[in-house]
Amino acid sequence: MIFWGCMISAVQPFVEKATRFSLQRLGVALQEMPEATCCPDPEISRTLGGDLWLTLAARNLSIANRTSMDVTVICNGCFETLTKANAELRSDKAVSEKVNSILNRHGREYSGSSQIYHMISFLHDVVGPEAVKSKLVQALSGLKCSPQYGCRILRENLDLAPKFDRLVETLGAQLIHTDTERLCCGVPTMYADPDFSLHERSEVKLREIKQAGAECITLFCPACAERIERAQVTLRSEGEDFNIPVVNYLELLALCLGASPSEIGAHLHRVPLNPILERIRKTP
């Protein structure tokens, strides 16, 4: 069962479109999560109202529990929230009972029967890189991609970074590693200190990525994507020269599986994807 979260559907519909296209081409039947809400956000929501954060997360998990299905998540923030909430509710019976006393009033029950998986794990462990490769009709012909893992998945599961790398290489891209690839993009500090977030996080990452010769930044996290794209727009207004495409891995996958740029809404990016589109080649 897929959990879209709020940001992908509301702000980055091209990621949702690319995901639907990719899963269909890979022969995966997409099971939607009906009546899902925001995860909610693992930073502001949890800080300002921890009990409410946990209850809302449990409500989302109860939807999957009802069908005994596991949950697959694209957004790193959603992954952190649902993973942490699931662990807390499973480990503390008193907390689980308290949350269920609220959910029961609305005809819902958290049972803890569902596992939470990141889309990286699903594509790598369930579908498999070789199966993905066998379906490709186009390849990235050595496109130099800088991976942005996102701090949230690095905190929850260290195995996800190397799996992400392998998935990128499966598409024919060349990974460009930098010393700041595991540095936070700047989203958490953006709310308290926008200047620090822009110049001490986003700009630091962008300078190193540019110096390393990367042609694009690829990631899964919609918050990272939004931050790094917006940062480049702001920095250009300050006289800096940043124009590095920021693209979700699922968009790259869809393009390599045969989607046209217009079909997935590639034109909606603030930083044009032209350098990527020019490098895509038909597979032999």
Regions found by a protein language model. Give the residues of each.
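Iron-sulfur cluster-binding electron-transfer modules in prokaryotic oxidoreductases
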Residues: 1-284
